[in-house]
UniProtKB/Swiss-Prot annotation:
This is D-galactonate dehydratase. The record marks 310 as: Transition state stabilizer. It comes from Klebsiella pneumoniae (strain 342). Pathway: Carbohydrate acid metabolism; D-galactonate degradation; D-glyceraldehyde 3-phosphate and pyruvate from D-galactonate: step 1/3. It catalyses: D-galactonate = 2-dehydro-3-deoxy-D-galactonate + H2O. One of its GO terms (molecular function) is magnesium ion binding. The keyword Magnesium applies. Binds 1 Mg(2+) ion per subunit.
Amino acid sequence: MKITKLTTWRLPPRWMFLKIETDEGIVGWGEPIVEGRARTVEAAVHELGDYLIGQDPARINDLWQVMYRAGFYRGGPILMSAIAGIDQALWDIKGKALNAPVWQLLGGLVRDKIKAYSWVGGDRPAEVIAGINTLRGMGFDTFKLNGCQEMGMIDSSRTVDAAVNTVAQIREAFGNDIEFGLDFHGRVSAPMAKLLIKELEPYRPLFIEEPVLAEQAEYYPRLAAQTAIPLAAGERMFSRFEFKRVLEAGGLAILQPDLSHAGGITECFKIAGMAEAADVSLAPHCPLGPIALAACLHVDFVSYNAVFQEQSMGIHYNQGAELLDFVKNKADFNMEGGYFKPLMKPGLGVDIDEDKVIEMSRRAPDWRNPVWRLADGVVAEW
C-alpha cells in the first residue's frame, strides 16, 4: 500500500480535517489544527506531504521520525500539530487495513469506559449555574470552567473575590453532587496564582488547569507545594521532550497533552507512559472536533493513568458547527451516565461525512481568539 494524496479542509467552527488516500482505496482521517492558525498548519501539512507521497502508510513510526527529524528546525505548535493530524490519519488507515480499532493495535483495552467532562460558561466565568443545570440533564456530573477573567500581574482584591465567588456559588448550589475543574488559561501570574489557589482551596475543585503559562513551568512545583488541589497542564506542550522536563521538575498531578497538537497518537501514547511512570494522571485536552476526540479516546482506553476526557459538545467556541455535525456514526459517540465507551469500528472509528465537509468548507471562518486589554491598555492573556 502506498500513500497517494493528502487533502485538507478548513471548517467551522475552528477546525481542519485531513484525508490521506492510498492506492488500495483505504483512506484515513486526521485533525491537524492550531486554533487561530489553520492556514499556517495547512501549509505545514502539505510541506510534510512531500515526505509521505509514495510511502507505505503502515510504517507509522518511521514516517513520524522522518517528519520530526528530517527538518533541522523541529517542534513547536505548528509543526507538531501538522504531524499530529497526519499521524491520526495513518493510524486510521492501519486500523482499517487490519480491520481493528486503534486501541486494539495499541495493546487492547485497559478499561471499559472513561469519564467525560463538559465545558460550561464562556471565555469569562458567568452564567455557569444555568449551564451546569442544563448539562446535568444530559448526563454530565463533571465540568470545567474558566477560573477567572483576565487578570493583571498584580491585581485587585475585587478581581480575586469575583473568581472565588463564582466557585462558592457553584458549591452552594450543587454541593458535592458535581465535580469541576478550573482553567486559569494561563491568564494568571505566579504571584496571583499563589493567592488565588489559596482562596479557592476550601471549595475543592477537581483540578486547576494552567495555573501559570507553560513558559513559567518552573512555578508548577512551587505552587503544588502550597496546595492540595491537583494542578494540571499540557495543552501548550508539544512533544515528549517538553513533558519530560515538566515531569522531572514535578508539581503537576495531571498531564493534558492535546492529540491534535502534541504529535498525535504515536507521541501522546509515549507521553501517557511517561506520566504513568511518574505517578501522574492523564486527561487529554480536546476542545476540538470528532477526529481529535476519537484519537483521544483510543489513547485513553489503553492508558492505565487516564482519568477523564474533555469533549467539545456545546462549548462556546462551536459557532457554525457542533461536535458531531460531520459524523455519520453519531451513536458510537453516545455517552452513558457521563462516560464514553470504546469506539469499536476499525481505525479511529469515526465515519466522516465527506460531502458535508466539502460543503461546509466553502464557508469556513478564519477564526481568531479575541485580543483583550487590561484597564491600563496593556494586552491581556486570553
